[in-house]
Amino acid sequence: MAVSASTFRGFDPAAIEFMADLAANNDRAWFQPRKAEYERLIRDPFEALVAELADRLETRGIPLHADPKRSIFRIYRDTRFSRDKSPYKTHLGASFPWMEPGERGYEVVDGSAHGNGGYFNFQPGEMYVGGGMWMPDKGRLEAFRRAIVEDPDRVRAALEEPGFVAAFGSVTAHETYKRLPPDVPADHPMADLMRYKDVVFGRRLADDEVTSPRLPDTLADAFAAGMPVLRFLATIRA
């Protein structure tokens, strides 16, 4: 039976152990007899967490979309084009896309995995909360570079906002280009940003934060701190 939206009490430490065991036994023969345990320990509390987070975001006016049925990624891997045929992910994540005012109230701008928004990762040894613009298409990446060239003060103001720096330090990238764009001098003060293939930020979460019933507030606090960068990235258009 699914946990109701009002009953998130923190993840059971056994949920962390389950994911560690899954990483060591990533096959259907191990998982299928334990599927009900996965649902009880991880899936159902995850849905309850996202439901409570949705309430926190709305109350605090943080324009990120949290939906218990849509925000959480599936545990099953798509192995069709991968040499790794392991059937299950060894982490579980949830994304919370950026919203803007529309004709019917706030609406999701880009609900794809490559849009601007927040993210929560549940994985033994890799618990974290963060956000940004993950691996955007070429047009948005070029728009980001134009913003750096045309209005560096606006970019700097977002990246150096004290609350953001206190929570996350700085933005980073999963991957970078080896070379700068040909029209950017090597001594440009934001040359490092020009090499970014995406723009992300995050902070690690301790296990006792993840097992706490205050986790929805912890995530909402993190997303609030990330607003200067998320708002800036929301203005980036191809």
Which residue ranges define each predicted feature?
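Aromatic- and glycine-enriched beta-alpha-beta binding-site module
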Residues: 78-151
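Inter-helical turn/loop segments and adjacent helix faces that build the functional surface
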Residues: 26-33, 135-142, 213
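Long, solvent-exposed, polar/charged low-complexity segments
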Residues: 2-21, 50, 54-57, 79, ...
